[in-house]
Structure formats: structure tokens, C-alpha cells
Amino acid sequence: MLRKRLQAGLCSLLLVLVLVFGPMERAIAFTDEQDLLLQAWRYVSQAYVDETFNHQNWWLIRQKFLKRPLKTRDEAYEAVGEMLALLDDPYTRLLRPEQYRSLKVSTSGELSGVGLQINVNPEVDVLEVILPLPGSPAEAAGIEAKDQILAIDGIDTRNIGLEEAAARMRGKKGSTVSLTVKSPKTDTVRTVKVTRDTIALNPVYDKLDEKNGEKVGYIRLNQFSANAKTEIIKSLNQLQKQGADRYVLDLRNNPGGLLQAGIEIARLWLDQETIVYTVNRQGIFESYSAVGQPLTDAPLVVLVNQATASASEILAGALQDNGRAMLVGEKTFGKGLIQSLFELPDGAGMAVTVAKYETPLHHDINKLGIMPDEVVPQEPIGYAMMGSETDLQYQAALDLLTQDQAIAQISQAS
């Protein structure tokens, strides 16, 4: 009898607990700003590559930030930014609506802006010019590689992220933007007004060259955009018709772009080999391989430098590790992390590091880069000089491609 009473009492207690606490949990209503914060938290919780979240209790971080009185959307964005900063991962970041749209546009094929490739120099934490695009307003304004962009329309670039800086330089065709530029060559600072124009993002430039009686096809890939593979195929077909039987693929100053574009372009050169391994948060490897016959098996040299990054390194690493090409130039940037884009309810977005990658020979190049087969140091040069007689790295590639011994080495490796 006592046992039955205890069981009945326990059931009553459980019922009271359910009645008291259940409705309270269901009654919690989050504001729109809290919902945005929660969605950002969930994306990281579900997809981030590091399950320790930089050795932190991610649930407690959620609770901490939910206690904030987030009254405006800007306050919500600031909270999300602070939350993501705790991961100590510069590639996992919030993209406000204009930044998110800008990032998607930059891989689509056309935009309106000043035509600068930019990056943040980690050594001095300053916005730095990789190169102005050929024929762009920035090039016409005299902006050069390695110039530092200190301010955009008076806004200090140290206080804004890379995407926001890019978004502020884009705008309606015919409008102007004021750039405060410091030249490391002369240590002078000047303010330049640049008129925005339509920037055609054709990611590929090609030409036929000749050395020692051999016809060499030169292909420069500036970015791994959605149309990059199609443009590479066009260039290869055109150069083959012109008689090219060996190639230089120029990946210098290519900051990367779409991972899938890098894999698809590697398949144009490889035959059944592994292109890249990705490693997720559980440590599970997934491989991407070439399928079918390559578009060409002609000898290939790839040019790389310190601004060759991300998807460019995937392609360069695949070609080098499989013995398909020799790399010439300087050690690459060393970005071996993969990000996915996630959209937030209000049109903002997030880039979240979801995996790391390794080359076919399982080299982890993050923060290490890829060392070329032949190191040729060279100061940064503009697009107009790339692939010219004064381009030392290009000339070294031509020498390799027109020497019988080097060609035999490349062909044997292939």
C-alpha cells in the first residue's frame, strides 16, 4: 500500500512539474533580433568545423548573448559579430545584407565598382590591394599592387571587414567613391576620387606565345567564379586551334572563389586522379576525383605566388601532387579552410568554416602554403606586365616548357 501511495505521489509530482514548467518553456517568445542571433548560433552549432568551438561551451555562450537587451537590428548584428569572434576564426563571419549580396555578386560574372582585388594583410592588419583589374577605374586612377586602402569615403577601413570594404567600393555606375591610399613605395598618403563603372568579371585571359620555335598557350585565371570553367574550356579550345601544344596556367594573385569551380577546372587537366580531400568536424574524409578523360594532356606549368589562395591552392596542389604540372613562382598563401554560406531571416548571411582540405598526398597547407617546384622570387607586378618579357616567373615557365629534359620530366610524371 505504501509503495502504491509513493508511486501515486511521484506521478502527481511529475504531473505538477509538467504543468508548471512545460507551459513556461513553451511560452518563451523571442524577439526578431533574438531569433536572428539564435539562427546564427544554430548554424555554427550544426556546421562549424571545430566541435570544441575554440574550447568553449557553445550553449553557455548562447545563453549569455540571449540575456542582452537587443532592441535594434544593428545591436543584433553587433552581438552576432561578437559571438562569432569568440571562435577566433577570421573566415567565420557575419555578412550584413549588403555584404551578403555583394559577395554573391562577386562570383556571378559582373558588377559595378572600382575594379580592385583586395585582401587584409595579416602582418600589419591593413586593407591591401592585390591588383587593380585591367582597364578598371582603379587602374586608371593609378592605384597599384601593395597600395594600402586606409579609408573609404572617410571611413577607417580598420573598423570594417573585408566584405564591407568591398561593398562600399561598389555602387551605381557613374557614382564616385573617395579612397585614401597609402603607397608603401613612397610612404605617401593621397586621396583619390574614383568614378565607378561596370566591371566585367571575365575570369580568364589567354594568349598564344612562342619561344624556341615552340607554341605555348598562356592562360591566366583571376578568380574561381561561376563561369570560370566555361571560359577555361573556351581558351583551351582556341589555343589548341592556334597550334599550342604546351601551356602555362597563371594562378598568381588569384584569391580563390567557388570550391566547386576549382574542382571542375582540375578535372579538365586530370585523368581519374584524386583532386582534394575535405575533412569535416567528425574527422571524416571525403574525396573529390577527376572523372572521364582530361581536355588536354599537354605539358603544363602553373605559376603561383603569395596571393595564390584557397581554391587556387586546391587546383595547384592537385596538379602538383598528381605530377600533372610543375609549379613555378613563390610559396602560396596557405588557406586550407572551406566555408559555406548560410542565409539569415532578414537577408543577411554568414560564412562558416565547415571543413578543412588536404591535397591528394594529404598535405595540410593551412597557414603553410604550397612550395613550388622551382622558386622564382619577384616583386608584385600589374596585369599589364604579367605574361610579358619582363615577367621573370613567366619566362622561367617558358624555359621549362621549351627544354626537352624538363618536358620529358613533366610528361613522365603525367
Curated annotation (Swiss-Prot):
<dbReference type="GO" id="GO:0006508">
    <property type="term" value="P:proteolysis"/>
</dbReference>
<keyword id="KW-0793">Thylakoid</keyword>
<dbReference type="Pfam" id="PF00595">
    <property type="entry name" value="PDZ"/>
</dbReference>
<dbReference type="InterPro" id="IPR036034">
    <property type="entry name" value="PDZ_sf"/>
</dbReference>
<feature type="active site" description="Charge relay system">
    <location>
        <position position="310"/>
    </location>
</feature>
<keyword id="KW-0720">Serine protease</keyword>
<dbReference type="InterPro" id="IPR001478">
    <property type="entry name" value="PDZ"/>
</dbReference>
<comment type="function">
    <text>Cleavage of the 16 C-terminal residues from the D1 precursor of photosystem II (PSII). This proteolytic processing is necessary to allow the light-driven assembly of the oxygen-evolving cluster (a tetranuclear manganese), which is responsible for photosynthetic water oxidation.</text>
</comment>
<keyword id="KW-0732">Signal</keyword>
<dbReference type="InterPro" id="IPR054621">
    <property type="entry name" value="Cterm_S41_CtpA"/>
</dbReference>
<keyword id="KW-0645">Protease</keyword>
<keyword id="KW-0378">Hydrolase</keyword>
<dbReference type="InterPro" id="IPR029045">
    <property type="entry name" value="ClpP/crotonase-like_dom_sf"/>
</dbReference>
<feature type="domain" description="PDZ">
    <location>
        <begin position="100"/>
        <end position="184"/>
    </location>
</feature>
<feature type="signal peptide">
    <location>
        <begin position="1"/>
        <end position="29"/>
    </location>
</feature>
<dbReference type="GO" id="GO:0007165">
    <property type="term" value="P:signal transduction"/>
</dbReference>
<dbReference type="InterPro" id="IPR004447">
    <property type="entry name" value="Peptidase_S41A"/>
</dbReference>
<dbReference type="Pfam" id="PF03572">
    <property type="entry name" value="Peptidase_S41"/>
</dbReference>
<feature type="active site" description="Charge relay system">
    <location>
        <position position="321"/>
    </location>
</feature>
<dbReference type="InterPro" id="IPR005151">
    <property type="entry name" value="Tail-specific_protease"/>
</dbReference>
<protein>
    <recommendedName>
        <fullName>Carboxyl-terminal-processing protease</fullName>
        <ecNumber>3.4.21.102</ecNumber>
    </recommendedName>
</protein>
<dbReference type="GO" id="GO:0030288">
    <property type="term" value="C:outer membrane-bounded periplasmic space"/>
</dbReference>
<comment type="similarity">
    <text>Belongs to the peptidase S41A family.</text>
</comment>
<dbReference type="GO" id="GO:0004252">
    <property type="term" value="F:serine-type endopeptidase activity"/>
</dbReference>
<feature type="active site" description="Charge relay system">
    <location>
        <position position="335"/>
    </location>
</feature>
<dbReference type="GO" id="GO:0031979">
    <property type="term" value="C:plasma membrane-derived thylakoid lumen"/>
</dbReference>
